């Protein structure tokens, strides 16, 4: 079984992986991953390119189902429910576990419709004042309301890159998820927009559990409560972020964070 640094804590576990293995065809991409994701905390996944961190992230809402030849063994649980149980509704899983991608990907619709589309589709609200209120609340939650409140009918694609990413975050929180997955959400953004998104993440963890993949170790150190280091599909070490960066227990972790490989 994969060795990793485990935490002893009475924190509430929101999601967990147990003996998780994943293959793309004949290639094994994840090896015996065991990890607890804590509620209303930010967990950063770090490691060199191809280490498995984004693959693991996508296991948490079954996005890997969309990849041909993908096979998963082991458990991934959210609130104690195995999300890979054949009886589980995958759409319901993805409603509870939202996703924000590396490149901002607003729908080719108005700002308003970007937010309203999924809640209307899932019958969370009806058209009218309730929907208007949800759109406003979601945009406020993503720190975007004041910038767009007078142009809600404008295309979401007309916004700046940083605004588009916040629109995607607003779209994700509009369906009231419990977990938000972020796959390198600032890698395509300028430093000012990056800082805005980082500040937003810290605010959002008051309501949501956040798991973020990042190549930026400084970003992990700034925003994450916990950090997991992946290498060659294995979870090498997982602990409080400060411990990972100040006093890592594994030599491979120390080598990575000091730039000796990566």
UniProtKB/Swiss-Prot annotation:
Reactions this protein catalyses: phosphate(out) + ATP + H2O = ADP + 2 phosphate(in) + H(+)
Membrane topology: Peripheral membrane protein
Function summary: Part of the ABC transporter complex PstSACB involved in phosphate import. Responsible for energy coupling to the transport system.
GO function terms (MF aspect): ATP binding; ATP hydrolysis activity; ATPase-coupled phosphate ion transmembrane transporter activity
Quaternary structure (record): The complex is composed of two ATP-binding proteins (PstB), two transmembrane proteins (PstC and PstA) and a solute-binding protein (PstS).
Subcellular location(s) of the protein: Cell inner membrane
GO annotation, biological process: phosphate ion transmembrane transport
Residues of the ABC transporter domain: 15-257
Protein name: Phosphate import ATP-binding protein PstB
Similarity remark: Belongs to the ABC transporter superfamily. Phosphate importer (TC 3.A.1.7) family.
Keyword ATP-binding: yes
Keywords: ATP-binding, Cell inner membrane, Cell membrane, Membrane, Nucleotide-binding, Phosphate transport, Translocase, Transport
Primary localization: membrane
Keyword ATP-binding: yes
